[in-house]
């Protein structure tokens, strides 16, 4: 498979402008891909048209054309016709629900496996894993299944952080992922911090950015992964 998938933890890092830190990661994928389709289904409160314009503005320096999948009469054909696919962040459950609703999971996976570049951030990265069972957001809608694209043979946890507000008594992210690995000890999870990304090119997987990621599987909990590490053994 000639997969080229860039899975960004977030659309921002710190107080930087929207998508600014992602440009060096995305730019190489646009050299031979000028016409992109954007999937805004995770952006509920923002609205699809507003979300599309926000992405166009954030990526304006890349000299590419971006259409919204919601603008096309045939969403599946829009995926086939595009040179590349963007999938934005927001609510992961709603995103996956709509992908099932419009029967898009298979065609996206088919096109990406054939070499079409895929760029997701936040929820758009979540769905690149085996399922959305390690997402952070609220299940506001029930998709037919939690099974996702499977561009990576493990689970993702974008926006990974260990921060806990003083006086807050809820679970930490590590505790939530521990619970997942207790229920499913055979499936790995990689938590990626804001500002970092995973990039798969064929049989090679790399952690991009200057921050550690964290690996969880069975009894292995929060094992650090060095920035820039080769993670190809996970494929």
From Swiss-Prot:
Task: Please report which protein family the annotation says this sequence is part of.
Answer: Belongs to the peptidase S51 family.
Function statement: Hydrolyzes dipeptides containing N-terminal aspartate residues. May play a role in allowing the cell to use peptide aspartate to spare carbon otherwise required for the synthesis of the aspartate family of amino acids.
Among InterPro entries, the record links this protein to: Class_I_gatase-like, Peptidase_S51, Peptidase_S51_dipeptidase-E
Q: Which UniProt keywords apply?
A: Cytoplasm, Dipeptidase, Hydrolase, Protease, Serine protease
Q: What is its EC number?
A: 3.4.13.21
Localization (cell): Cytoplasm
**Main localisation, per the record?**
cytoplasm
The record's annotation in CDD domains points to: GAT1_Peptidase_E (cd03146)
> Which GO terms of the cellular component aspect does the record hold?
cytoplasm
Instruction: Enumerate the catalysed reactions.
Output: Dipeptidase E catalyzes the hydrolysis of dipeptides Asp-|-Xaa. It does not act on peptides with N-terminal Glu, Asn or Gln, nor does it cleave isoaspartyl peptides
- Taxonomically, the superkingdom here is Bacteria
Q: Name one GO biological process term.
A: proteolysis
- Report the protein name in the record: Peptidase E
Source organism: Shewanella amazonensis (strain ATCC BAA-1098 / SB2B)
Catalytic residues as annotated in Swiss-Prot or TrEMBL: 122 (charge relay system), 137 (charge relay system), 159 (charge relay system)
Gene Ontology MF term list: dipeptidase activity; serine-type peptidase activity
